[in-house]
Design a protein with these regions (language model features):
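Sec-dependent signal peptide recognition
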Residues: 2-8
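C-terminal motif of bacterial Sec signal peptides marking the signal peptidase cleavage site
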Residues: 13-16
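Calcium-binding acidic motifs and repeat modules
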Residues: 18-83, 89-201
């Protein structure tokens, strides 16, 4: 899947975005802290998630039930209490999934990559900003390779990754920040990496 297609899918999937302020980060929190949002895994929820055919289907169940938990604050990055590079609400969605731990780690690696896209100022095209954007894009390539290594089907990789990006860029400000990052990658190429353990964080 090309970066252009991914960009179009993300922009198309984000509707009713709210305008937000300029803050790029929240106040620092202890790295040992737990995420500020947690979803209770009831027997009914577990059974419902286990009955889904794909990871993306599970994510959609969680989204439909817990959409109000999504952060829509003025902060570009939103709350990350344990400072692991993943917004607390998105981490809560991933933590409740009925998947193996290697798959959960791959999802978090993908979510962390998506979050990092908007953690830097890419409004100006400078040598350093292009270099940073390229570095982040390579992390996304590694996340895709990790998905495949842990056994996630290609269609599920595409759909789950697209949904995580949509959840991450869920305000107008966040979407515009992502587009600023993506603009710096115009004309660049991406090489599909082999599914190897070395690409998993």
């Amino acid at each position: 899947m090309t970066r252009t297609l991914m960009t179009m899918l993300v922009v198309a999937s984000i509707a009713g975005c709210n305008s937000s302020g300029d803050s790029r980060s929240t106040s620092p929190s202890p790295a040992s802290a737990t995420p500020s949002i947690q979803i209770e895994k009831t027997d009914e929820l577990i059974a419902t998630l286990k009955s889904q055919k794909t990871i993306n289907d599970q994510l959609m169940v969680i989204y439909e039930r817990y959409e109000p938990l999504l952060d829509r604050s003025d902060s570009l990055t939103g709350p990350d209490t344990n400072q692991d590079g993943i917004r607390d609400d998105i981490e809560a969605f991933i933590d409740v999934l009925e998947v193996t731990e290697p798959v959960r780690k791959a999802l978090k690696q993908d979510a962390r990559s998506a979050q990092e896209n908007i953690s830097h100022d890419f409004s100006d095209k400078t040598e350093s900003s292009v270099s940073k954007a390229t570095e982040i894009s390579k992390k996304f390539d590694r996340a895709l390779a990790c998905y495949e290594f842990v056994g996630v089907e290609v269609d599920d990789i595409i759909n789950s990754s697209r949904l995580l990006m949509s959840l991450t860029y869920n305000t107008k400000k966040r979407t515009l920040a992502f587009l600023s990052y993506n603009r710096l990658l115009n004309g660049s190429t991406s090489v599909m990496l082999a599914p190897e353990a070395t690409y998993c964080e």
